[in-house]
Amino acid sequence: MIPGEYFISKGDIECNVDRKTTKIKVINTGDRPIQVGSHCHFFEINRMMSFDRSEAFGMRLNIAAGTAVRFEPGEEKEVELVAFSGARRAFGINNIVNGDTTLEINKQHSLAKLKTENFKNK
């Protein structure tokens, strides 16, 4: 074995198999680039990002761990989201949800909070 050497199995690696996914269109309405990381609760990303946040509740980008997607000012992109797994709780980022993303009451409360915090939402 050589230090740092990789032993790669044959075949494809599949991630997020049998998990709910959705595609949404997102536009950066701000004047600065915005980068969103792989495990960020997409519902709570930057308030200048305009998209249907209801569709993104309890979901993150369906990209490899440790990577990100960058949105330039005025840029519109379609991204694929995947549902959280495990306990499916979201905390922090913009302090909108801070709890269980499987409960409809939490979703409705969070959508109402978006309005008071001036988040873009289609």
Swiss-Prot record:
CDD domains: Urease_beta. Its EC number is 3.5.1.5. Keywords: Cytoplasm, Hydrolase. One of its GO terms (biological process) is urea catabolic process. Heterotrimer of UreA (gamma), UreB (beta) and UreC (alpha) subunits. Three heterotrimers associate to form the active enzyme. It comes from Flavobacterium johnsoniae (strain ATCC 17061 / DSM 2064 / JCM 8514 / BCRC 14874 / CCUG 350202 / NBRC 14942 / NCIMB 11054 / UW101) (Cytophaga johnsonae). One of its GO terms (molecular function) is urease activity. It is found in: Cytoplasm. InterPro entries: Urease_beta-like, Urease_betasu_sf, Urease_subunit. Its main location: cytoplasm. This is Urease subunit beta. It catalyses: urea + 2 H2O + H(+) = hydrogencarbonate + 2 NH4(+). One of its GO terms (cellular component) is urease complex. Gene3D superfamilies: Urease, beta subunit. Belongs to the urease beta subunit family. It comes from the Bacteria. Pathway: Nitrogen metabolism; urea degradation; CO(2) and NH(3) from urea (urease route): step 1/1.
